């Protein structure tokens, strides 16, 4: 009798874990939609009124807003890849597994197509 109760409790725990796992995607989307508002609690200790840009270096130490600012000041020097053609198909063709390498090479050469 005790063994049967133990099996039932294990089964219910497993069922509960499966239910939680099946709803993880929905819970992630809800958190994003709410802007990571954790039920009124401020988990990180930061004020909600502070723009994320002002605390980005605290969250991600490598984050620098100055890089964007410098690029906006000198737009003529920015490299913009030419995206004139469609994206490559991700299928196994010949000896390559995809055409991503060819696309990257094309973008790096300013969109000038090379004849092979």
Curated annotation (Swiss-Prot):
Keywords: Cytoplasm, Nucleus. It comes from the Eukaryota. Residues 8-22 have a biased composition (Polar residues). It is found in: Cytoplasm; Nucleus. Belongs to the DIF1/spd1 family. Mediates the nuclear localization of the ribonucleotide reductase. This is Damage-regulated import facilitator 1. GO terms for cellular component: cytoplasm; nucleus. The lineage of its organism: Eukaryota, Fungi, Dikarya, Ascomycota, Saccharomycotina. Residues 1-22 are annotated as: Disordered.
């Amino acid at each position: 009798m005790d063994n049967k109760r133990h099996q039932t409790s294990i089964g219910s725990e497993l069922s509960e874990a499966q239910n939680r796992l099946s709803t993880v995607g929905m819970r992630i989307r809800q958190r994003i939609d709410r802007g990571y508002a954790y039920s009124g609690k401020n988990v990180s200790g930061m004020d909600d009124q502070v723009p994320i840009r002002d605390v980005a270096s605290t969250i991600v130490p490598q984050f620098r807003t100055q890089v964007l600012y410098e690029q906006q000041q000198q737009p003529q020097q920015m490299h913009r890849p030419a995206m004139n053609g469609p994206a490559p198909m991700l299928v196994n063709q010949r000896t390559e597994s995809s055409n991503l390498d060819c696309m990257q090479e094309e973008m790096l050469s300013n969109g000038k197509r090379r004849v092979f």
